[in-house]
Design a protein with these regions (language model features):
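ABC family nucleotide-binding domain
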Residues: 2-215
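H-loop (His-switch) and adjacent beta-strand-loop-beta switch element
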Residues: 212-225
Length: 249
């Protein structure tokens, strides 16, 4: 069943006296429970595509449906409600609040959603335990490894039970062992029914996923539907991990 449908999407940015087509006639369907990636070099349009899919922006033309709702011309308030109820985000830089502990970082989206304190606490604890960080619930981000911070970010992304999670270069700041742990966690989430879309420029990550959408010059270049290897090690080149990071993914 289609969760996301894009039909002839165009996104034009006006820069001075020029019109720049970031997306040029993109059509795409993503089904519920899919685990896929959007891959492409800088300037390919992949980030713009993620912004539209994540209801952070609207297209210049074309139609975009999320869970059957047309958001092509949605207002900022309508987009915000869609993000809060159906979409989760995981970022390369984690985007955690450094002065809040794990529990309160994960609770934050529910504060904006108006969820009661009791329900917030119950859902946050469940999400934290789902990513195996129950023993770190009262630590702040500065007391965690990079891999642990990313798992906190994932818990925060799933705490409102979204239909779809977008992950922007989620292993970009992690060593390969920790990156493998994060990729496995995403796969488990997809198997539970949550659609996972990873945005990356890394072919090694893309080759691990069941489907890849390759962007080039604002268009979809290749859609690979065939299953890829799910057992080969995740070979990624990342910065040297911080002390303790590899031992505590």
């Amino acid at each position: 069943m289609a969760l996301v449908e894009l039909r002839d999407i165009r996104k034009i940015y006006h820069v001075g006296d020029q019109d720049i087509a970031a997306l040029d006639g993109v059509s795409l369907t993503i089904d519920a429970g899919e685990f896929l990636c959007i891959i492409g070099p800088s300037g390919s349009g992949k980030s713009t595509l993620m912004h539209l899919l994540g209801c952070l922006d609207t297209p210049t033309s074309g139609s975009l449906l999320i869970d059957g709702v047309d958001v092509s011309n949605a207002t900022d308030d309508q987009l915000s409600r869609m993000r809060n109820s159906k979409i989760g985000f995981v970022f390369q830089a984690f985007n955690l609040l450094p002065k809040l502990d794990v529990l309160h970082n994960v609770e934050l989206p529910m504060v904006y959603a108006g969820v009661s304190a009791k329900v917030r606490r119950e859902r946050a604890i469940a999400a934290i335990e789902r990513v195996d960080l129950g023993h770190r619930m009262y630590n702040t981000p500065l007391q965690l490894s990079g891999g642990q911070c990313q798992r906190v970010a994932i818990a925060r992304a799933i705490v409102n039970n979204p239909k779809i999670v977008f992950a922007d270069e989620p292993t970009g700041n992690l060593d390969s062992k920790t990156g493998e742990t994060i990729l496995t966690l995403f796969r488990e989430l997809a198997e539970s029914g949550c659609t996972i879309v990873i945005v990356t420029h890394d072919n090694n990550i893309a080759s691990r996923l069941p489907r890849r959408i390759e962007m080039r010059d604002g268009r979809i270049r290749v859609g690979v539907e065939a299953a890829k290897s799910q057992t080969a090690p995740l070979l990624v080149s990342h910065p040297t991990p911080q002390k303790g990071e590899e031992a505590q993914p």
